[in-house]
Structures are given as structure tokens and as C-alpha cells.
UniProtKB/Swiss-Prot annotation:
<keyword id="KW-0679">Respiratory chain</keyword>
<comment type="function">
    <text>Core subunit of the mitochondrial membrane respiratory chain NADH dehydrogenase (Complex I) that is believed to belong to the minimal assembly required for catalysis. Complex I functions in the transfer of electrons from NADH to the respiratory chain. The immediate electron acceptor for the enzyme is believed to be ubiquinone.</text>
</comment>
<keyword id="KW-1133">Transmembrane helix</keyword>
<keyword id="KW-0496">Mitochondrion</keyword>
<feature type="transmembrane region" description="Helical">
    <location>
        <begin position="48"/>
        <end position="68"/>
    </location>
</feature>
<keyword id="KW-0813">Transport</keyword>
<keyword id="KW-1278">Translocase</keyword>
<keyword id="KW-0472">Membrane</keyword>
<comment type="similarity">
    <text>Belongs to the complex I subunit 6 family.</text>
</comment>
<protein>
    <recommendedName>
        <fullName>NADH-ubiquinone oxidoreductase chain 6</fullName>
        <ecNumber>7.1.1.2</ecNumber>
    </recommendedName>
</protein>
<keyword id="KW-0812">Transmembrane</keyword>
<keyword id="KW-0249">Electron transport</keyword>
<keyword id="KW-0830">Ubiquinone</keyword>
<feature type="transmembrane region" description="Helical">
    <location>
        <begin position="79"/>
        <end position="99"/>
    </location>
</feature>
<keyword id="KW-0520">NAD</keyword>
<feature type="transmembrane region" description="Helical">
    <location>
        <begin position="1"/>
        <end position="21"/>
    </location>
</feature>
<dbReference type="GO" id="GO:0031966">
    <property type="term" value="C:mitochondrial membrane"/>
</dbReference>
Length: 158
């Protein structure tokens, strides 16, 4: 789950690059992207490796940022409507990802095969999972509470 959150947050942070036109906003995007990657490395692998990677990223970003600022003329930084809309939609997506119920979902997809096998006599994976069915469509996981309607629709389509 943490890998999925990292990917969504990195995609949302780096999508701001498309509308960032000034070096200050580009530097902030690079810095926040490196911070997200370093936190993920620190959580998944090692805190020491994450810290060293963070120091490397921050030093590189600071040198690049200061170089670009010395070349680029100073301008007033203003938020435009596109920027506000993208940031608010990214925050909303992150909030929705945090609210998802992962109790009946496995990333490996084995529960999906169990759902399709219920009509063939395969035992459900979880004790009370006969009420739930999972369908994975283009990376979005849907949990259906009415298993009989889901099974009937699958049997009629095949």
C-alpha cells in the first residue's frame, strides 16, 4: 500500500511541473518529489539509506536551484487557477486513497481468482468473504457486497 501511495503522490507532485513556469516552483516540485522518495526508502529499506539519499538529493537540488535562480530574472510568483485546481485535486485523490478499505483486497490478485472460482467449489479466502467480490479494472479496485448478483452477471457473460 505504501508503494501505491508513493506512486500516486509522486505523480501528483510531478504533474505540477506541467504548469510550473518559474524556477522557484520547479525547485519546490523537485524538492518535494525527492522528499517523498526518501521517506519511502526510509520506511521500506533503511532509515540510514533514506537519510543519505535525502542529503544527496537536497544538496544536488540546492546547487541546481541556486544556479537557475542566479540566471533567471526575478519575477513575482503568483498562483494561477490551473495550479490551484491541480493541487486541490491531488489532495483529494490522496484523501480518497487513504479512505480505501484494504481488508478484502490483495495486490497479488489471488482473491480475484478466488471470486471466479467460487462457482466451481473453491473455498473463499476469508471466513466471511462470501458476501464480497472484488473486481480489478484498470488499477481501480471495486468491492461488491452482493456476491450473488456479481456471480450471476459473470456467469451470464461467459
Amino acid at each position: 500500500m505504501s508503494v501505491m501511495i508513493m506512486c500516486v503522490s509522486l505523480m501528483s507532485v510531478f504533474s505540477i511541473v506541467l504548469i510550473a513556469k518559474q524556477p522557484i516552483s520547479l525547485g519546490l516540485v523537485l524538492l518535494s518529489g525527492s522528499m517523498i522518495a526518501c521517506v519511502e526508502i526510509a520506511l521500506e529499506v533503511s532509515s540510514l539509506l533514506g537519510f543519505l539519499l535525502f542529503l544527496t538529493y537536497v544538496s544536488g537540488v540546492m546547487v541546481l536551484f541556486l544556479y537557475v535562480l542566479s540566471i533567471y530574472p526575478n519575477e513575482v510568483y503568483r498562483f494561477n487557477l490551473e495550479f490551484v485546481m491541480i493541487v486541490s485535486s491531488c489532495c483529494a485523490m490522496m484523501g480518497l486513497v487513504g479512505l480505501m478499505n484494504y481488508e478484502y483486497v490483495e495486490i497479488s490478485g489471488s482473491i480475484i481468482f478466488k471470486v471466479y472460482g467460487w462457482s466451481k467449489g473453491v473455498k473463499p479466502m476469508y471466513p466471511n468473504s462470501s458476501r464480497f467480490a472484488v473486481c480489478d479494472v484498470s488499477g481501480v479496485v471495486f468491492v461488491y457486497k452482493n456476491h450473488s448478483a456479481f456471480a450471476k452477471s459473470k456467469m451470464s457473460s461467459s
